[in-house]
Amino acid sequence: MRVSVAERARLSVLIGRRAFHSVVGGINAHPLLRWRFASTKTDRLLIAPQDLRTADATRASEIYAGRFAFAGKVVICDRRSPFEMTPPSDEWAVTLLSFVWLRHLRAADSAITRSNARSLIDEWINVQGGWNSSGWRIDILSRRIICWLSQAPFVLQDADARFYRRFIRSLSRQVRYLRRNANDTREGLPRLQAIIALNYATLCMQGQSGYLRGNVRRLIEELRRQVLPDGGHVSRNPGALIELLADLLPLRQLFSARQLQPPQALNNAIDRVMPMLRFFRHGDGNFAQFNGVGPTPVDLLATVLAYDDARGTPVSNAPHSGYQRIDAGQAALLMDTGPPPPMEMSQEAHAGCLSFEMSWKQHRLVVNCGLPAVNKENWRQVARATPAHSTVTLNDRSSCRFLESLSIRQLFGGTPIISGPRDVRIERESSGAPTLRASHDGYVSDCGVVHTRAVNLSADGRALDGEDSFTGPDGQPLPADATAEFAIRFHLHPAIKASRLADGRGVILLLHDRDLWTFATLADAVELEESVFLAGSDGPRRTVQIVIYGRVGQPSAVRWSFRHTPPAAPGARPDRAQEPELPL
């Protein structure tokens, strides 16, 4: 896949900008220079933000016993400080240093857990707060400030004057450091969360009112940059919306509690994002697996949705975010119909253009592989590739090109997408049975092929007819001797039991409630192969995928269908698969 001159120039500018911010951040984080952010003045806490994230009181006893189980790794401290231990993974270190686990101690809410929380904070101040720079990365720092402010009433209850001064002095120092360096973090959600943390501090701490106007202005600018008109996030990661609202809703409450009018941009962002939470949900309450989504935090999602006063039907068209949704009967279909996000915000984006997910009642049928909750880096490269999605792969290549480089990964905090689909066209027909037709040019530079996908969901939701077709970049038919080989993949949810039909052109899908769905196609090469569903709540799970193989000119279009059959009586045999129909 070739990279255009414009894309090369943009990449060079981004690398230069990120390198500059990295150098500046490193200089400011140097222990010999960090004294600039110290102050002899001790501020006072005026109010604490609400923490909407779910807490588990049973985790408090583990932490008290020195057993720190984060991100799938366990460290037993054996009377040593956890901040002196060698982290078993970066994810474990981020969780420890961000103090998100303080909420579990608060949930237990006893004199012992309060004392334990103060001891651990004291240890961090001794070990990390002065001379060790690992806890001063901007994304970690932002989350720690929010957590310390949110849990301050719990932590400071019964605390002596010495700890109170020490706590506030350290918190003030961290806020000053963040104020100076917030723009040195990478673009996207991390930068927005840094600015949100600054606004939390401005509203919660005495002596910060002079920074209110500037912090609010930065918040407004970043919200307008990152929250799209249809409510999606500019990174195209649906999971970012849950995390964003979990921080924005308490921020709006803080403005009201301080008798200040929340910025209109804040209210607008919340109002736009809230309906998108329903847009991305399947019938079982989980999010569709697009562009970096892992296991859905269903408890947090339910908490956030409780603030939605409208509770209306989700929108069906999100053109700015690049997604489409069809609801019919008890079925829901979501499709990725957008190009990759801007290069500087594409570290988590996937090469899944025109992939779709489908659910029936409380069951997910067709899915993408998603990402696991822990050990993401071990799976990220595989999960982002096109074959991990329910769409078409040509010549076993992804429709996007990732810039795989250790130095780039360290600089950008991930692997950006440097080229991919740019011309993604969508036609939507809502009269009668809802129909979508979309195409993308992600394979034009490598294969000279435009992929078009059309899907039609019956009005009762019991039949999905689809067609994948291939043309040249000018829309002309491909020659019969075209050499590009395609694989049309349909990854199935691990709860689905699948078996091939005797004729080899179909697959029977058995759901938990004994509902039957039949996949059918006229293509000769239909396989049922192993797959993995990475986004399971209990970790990666084995599953299967339906794969149709062929060559783009032979044929130039492949029709397929999923059809529902009522629950089978004991001993009954399923009907023979019907020929796919596509009334387009």
Q: What is the role of each PLM region?
A:
Residues 71, 327-331, 361, 395, ...:
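Short strand-coil-strand connectors
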Residues 97, 194, 322, 354, ...:
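Residues that flank catalytic or metal-binding motifs in active/ligand-binding sites
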Residues 2, 142, 377-584:
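CBM-like, beta-strand-rich accessory domains located in the C-terminal region of large
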Residues 90-270:
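Aromatic-lined, polymer-binding surfaces characteristic
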